[in-house]
Amino acid sequence: MRNDNDKKTSLILSACGVIPVVWLALLTAPYVGGGIVEIIRGLTDAMGSPFAITVCEDSVKTVLIFLAAYGMAIGIYFSTRRNYRRREEHGSAKWGNADALNKKYRDKDPSENKLLTQNVRIGLDGKKHRRNLNILVCGGSGAGKTRFFCKPNAMQCNTSFVVLDPKGEIVRDIGGLLESKGYEVRVLDLINMHRSHCYNPFVYLRNDNDVQRLVTNLFKATTPKGSQSQDPFWDTAASMLLLALVFYLKYEAPPDEQNFPMVMELLRAGEVREDDDSYVSPLDELFDRLEMVNPEHIALKYYRDYHSGSAKTLKSIQITLAARLEKFNLESLAGLTATDELDLPSLGEKKVALFALIPDNDTSFNFLVSILYTQLFQQLFYLADHKYGGSLPVHCHFIMDEFANVSLPDDFDKILSVMRSRGVSVSIILQNLAQLKALFEKQWESIVGNCDEFLYLGGNEQSTHKYVSELLGKETIDTNTYGKSSGRSGNYSTNYQISGRELMTPDEVRMLDNRYALLFIRGERPVMDFKYDIMKHPNVKLTADGGQPPYIHGEPTQAVATLVFDSDIPQNAVSVNAVSTSYELLSDEDLEEIFNI
């Protein structure tokens, strides 16, 4: 592009040069007959009045001769021209200016920005600066990913937030600030589940495709990393059984029974006896009744496919599915998923902060966060497309701290590429690029490419050092070489040369001062700037870092019952035996017989 522009400029200047050539030819024409001496003398006099042009019989001939000479000169110039790029022979990389970059990308309203470094912000309105708001943050343990990026951006209080919060540090420090700014704070706490808001994935199943996605994502999220089944039959058959159960609950069960604990109840009701192929389990009876009502029910189709094997095969399939869902046998997880309090679509309509707390030393329950992410993207995209004309009224910012700890959909790179127009953005936070390569072996470069901002906070992983060094590029520098020869006619020489050098070599990237960060914005020079100082944020006084008490979620805020005991017990008080109460569960047939229906 640069060479094309230079060529176009040269042609324009050459064409403009015709005018002075013709002018000079007309001044010279009256003196051509007197020879070179007369031409020199006449031109000297003509310069006294340069626009007093006299047309004579030699004017046309002189103009043609001058134009021919000019054309030959231009032809020689273009034919012998060299493509020089002075001071860029080995590379044109150089450092950008943080203040200039900030002036170009920041929003005038300080609260309507994402904080990248101490002196660089980027506004939320991507239509102004034509960059997406997806940010890739890379920094080793202790580099300040949470303190210098996650918390300052959440403290901006300018979007809805979905924060993956290992250990619960972020919600503890800034939850009070968010509530004081009018946010609804919701917490999916997989560390202390008794303090968590409830999350029921069944609530967000709009159609059959959503059911299929839920089951597929559940199986993917519960598959250990690096494991490959040599026989996928069992997983496929188990997924068919799970689809049958989920479809049955979605279309036939009341809303309060549409949850994973009820899936486990149905699974336990499907007892299979290997020595008795004629045995009909309660689950079989349930689907037999469904067949009488609706023979083409989608749940029945999947159940027939599952039930086409022998009793031994069916037993193995049930065991496979039970192993996938075994976490839902825990009372804590069953209670958490029995109902729903998260109201996921509301994140795109009003300011809500949703925190997903996961243990940093145990990944047993992280599959639930994976399902949450998938359903959040589906709900927000659907809301933007079908209710708000393509873009959410409230921007939603996903802050994915410890990104590598949660399984994400295989097409996450495609989701990343289409979320900008919907008013959704993601901050991917990693310890190093090796984590991203392990998660998305083939798509990791596409994910990096869909993040217009890359923030490097420092680390100690070699491949990341090399990647950052190559991203910085090479610059052209001056070098000196010295020579000295000894002897009777010895001499000393100095040679000056130019050479190429990386802006920062991999070892210099490794030695990056812990106070600094490297910032890359698509189409801009790289910037080295201070990491953001959280203590300089205007809202820090409302957080635990600013001296406020830590935010505690899931605690009762008011008494729901009160017992008052009178200290003066009457002397004539007598004890009364409590009336015993018993319960009996009756089937539909028993009820019909009792009430004579």
Where are these regions (language model features)?
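Basic- and hydrophobic-enriched, low-structure N-terminal and domain-boundary segments
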Residues: 1-143, 147-150, 194, 485, ...
